Amino acid sequence: MTSFEIRQMWLKFFASKNHHIAKSSSLIPRNEANLLWVNAGITPLKKYFDGTQTPPFRRITNVQKCIRTNDIKNVGKTSRHHTFFEMLGNFSIGNYFKKEAIHYAFELLTSPKWFAFPLEKLYITYFFQDQDTYQYWLDLGVEKNHLIPLKSNFWQIGPGPSGPCTEIFFDRGKTFDPRNKELIIQDLENDRFIEIWNIVFSQYNCDPKLPIEKYQELPSKNIDTGAGLERLACILQNTKTNFETDLFFPLIKALEKMTQIKYTGQESFKIIADHLKTLVFAINDGAVLTNEKRGYVLKKLLRRAANEGKKLGLDKPFLHQLVPPTAAMMKDFYKELCTNQEIIAKVLLQQENIFEQTLKTAEKTFLQHLTQNTLSGQNFFKLYDTYGIPEDLILDYAKKKNITTDYQKFQELLHDHQNLSKQNQTSQIHMNKQEESFLQFLTPSEFIGYTNFTCKTKVIKVFDKGIVLEKTPFYANMGGQIEDEGWIDNTKVTKITKLPNGQILHEVQGNFCEGQEVYACIEKTKRNQISYHHTATHLLEAVLQKQLGSHLKKQGSSVGFSSLRYDFNHFEKITPQTLLQIEKEVNQLIQKSVPVKIEQLSIPDAQKKYATLLEQNQKAKYKDKVRIVSIDTFSVDLCGGTHATNTKDLEHFTILSCESISSGIYRIEAVCNNNCQESLNAKLVPYQNDLHQLTQKAKSLQTQNLIFDVKNFPPITQSYQDILNYQKHIKAQQQALVLFEKKVLEYHQKNMVQAESNFLPPQITKKMMLTIEEEKPLEVLKFFMNHIFDKYHLEVLFLSYVQPEKIVFLCKSKTLHAGNLIKEAVSLVCGSGGGNASLAQGGTKKTKNLEQVLNFVKTKLEIN
């Protein structure tokens, strides 16, 4: 049975049991700041299990792409450790429970119509206090000696939903390990008993302060299951390990051809095949290789795979060449890999080249981290973790240079790092505690805000945190669109949130009671501006994908009344010319006055009309209808937000900025409608301030004969081009001012030298003091001091530059220590200063004490 057939059989079986088939979500979690990857089938459904949102379907099945990297060191060493894997799942949210879940698992695994596993090959574990589960399996015909009670079979990861679980193992026979079921009981690594399915009965609210027996029952009991596709394929295809299944072996065969080496189970083949799949799927979902968070994880995988390639004789970049066979291997279920394989290969080649450059300097970096011919454990780990130098390569350098390494300490640090990663992976799927009062509130509330901004309505529920109305024009903060502002009976609404069952909660000051009639009103002007910016965001996204490529995916957005923000992935720097073209194309669509079409379609109708669109989105979000927003055929998207009725409502679109917020992630800020001029002006203010300061400085430098012509900014056109023009203009003016300043300096220097007799005493001596009161740039005075010192071959020159509010002292010397002289002199008048033996500078604001300083210096220089 092929992996494609296994997936299809799983989905077909649960569809026959009235489960909704949900498309795999992206590997990059949405709205999960602390979660690096989707790492379990339940991850995208978490919001339904903890009651944050009401599920559109109570029964769901999926094949979920997952990434886990906490056991990366085991990949290639064991038969079934992977960084990328597919989890087959079936889920019940407040619908069926233990008995049905166990019956479904039994039927799918043992029925001749489905997987047809021999019953005697199955071993089942269950929570030792869960007698219901034990009895259900027994009733289905599982032998008692195949049912194993375990204290560890209880799933909990902190406060929130938790419960007992039952695990299903397949016995591959004594040829894989002579030991018996003690392998399961003692949780020993082995190739005989393969865990193929875990069913979690989520029925309690975990309270870490209490023993399990005291946990409270959940108001909504759930079923969460996961079966590893790779493990099922290994059993059903009768292969020695997962790597010989059709989920890996075509890639291994491509590696054989590339290396001219026969695969006989070598770790390098397995590591490359595993890591490459992870890289291909992650990049396809919009992940970027960076030096932080998930990007750093991918970079480590790439470098580890590249280093394994070197062990097979692949000294040049090769991973990018394996993208087509990877896409071909997975195309039956993931057609998008073939569409995007060119861009994926381009990203990989770019990163492989960067790694090659790293390796060229790796030995030098290695030598820089040695202490007395020893590499400490801390520095070993730093080279491995920070610089990305593979462990094997570090050991090779050490052996070649006869360097002692603290390998044990490195292993300890690596172990600690991996444990931390495991803790993070576990905590990442932590769920919120179910809010029972919200979950149990089922009275419907109608949102009428797409077409109505005001309404007479009544209060149907009062919570501590706010009130729910029978119907409401208020849009809650969701989907990147900010919430509405407004009033209920002249009382300001402070916050709008959506409850688990779809109603809108209005946080509002004042006393309200259930049944009370009220008048709800949103701020129309702000709502309109929000709607315009939402439509502009759709246009921007479509143009970005057209200009930069289909690999581009939204990484976050914020739609407000004064601006919009759109975050996206891209692997190259975005030029100003590209941004101007993007802005131009959005404005062209606005000027075409294209109607914004809103459709509410049933799932079957939407699948007929927009099959590709639904394929690209998570259909599990929607129950019986989907809302589709289309702007001609240029932008078609699933969206629940508010929009303009026509692109002409946007009037104009201006990009305000485009910046890299992290490696490979960019953020565009833009505005439309009457916000353009005001927002653009605000962006231009810093440049106007710079020009004002430049003008003031130019005036202070000007002389009767030297005038600096400050040029004004070019006219504003309400475009990103204005920002570029202002940047260019300021830069040109600053460069011109630098040249002018140099010219003015030369002018003053020349004049001062020509008039030197006006500043010198009648008699020139080797030790000389000068006092200058005429206003001069300090640089001119320093030039003049050097000129006089050298021209007259002086030993010491002490110059006092006297201004109304301060005095500056300069000293140049061949004999006395200039720095010490300045320090002693200014200390007499509470000044400060210093320098070296030959040149020093100081100053004071106590201008009335000049004579005290001069007398001191005269004494020091022995001047009469």
UniProtKB/Swiss-Prot annotation:
Biological processes, Gene Ontology terms: alanyl-tRNA aminoacylation
GO CC list: cytosol
Annotated Zn(2+) binding sites: 534, 538, 639, 643
PROSITE patterns: AA_TRNA_LIGASE_II_ALA
Subcellular location: Cytoplasm
EC supergroup of this enzyme: ligase
Listed GO MF terms: alanine-tRNA ligase activity; aminoacyl-tRNA deacylase activity; ATP binding; tRNA binding; zinc ion binding
Alphabetical UniProt keywords: Aminoacyl-tRNA synthetase, ATP-binding, Cytoplasm, Ligase, Metal-binding, Nucleotide-binding, Protein biosynthesis, RNA-binding, tRNA-binding, Zinc
A family per Pfam: DHHA1
Cofactor field: Zn(2+)
Catalytic activity: tRNA(Ala) + L-alanine + ATP = L-alanyl-tRNA(Ala) + AMP + diphosphate
Keyword Ligase: yes
EC number: 6.1.1.7
Cofactor remark from the record: Binds 1 zinc ion per subunit.
Family: Belongs to the class-II aminoacyl-tRNA synthetase family.
Domain notes: Consists of three domains; the N-terminal catalytic domain, the editing domain and the C-terminal C-Ala domain. The editing domain removes incorrectly charged amino acids, while the C-Ala domain, along with tRNA(Ala), serves as a bridge to cooperatively bring together the editing and aminoacylation centers thus stimulating deacylation of misacylated tRNAs.
Described function: Catalyzes the attachment of alanine to tRNA(Ala) in a two-step reaction: alanine is first activated by ATP to form Ala-AMP and then transferred to the acceptor end of tRNA(Ala). Also edits incorrectly charged Ser-tRNA(Ala) and Gly-tRNA(Ala) via its editing domain.
Name this polypeptide is given: Alanine--tRNA ligase
Gene: alaS
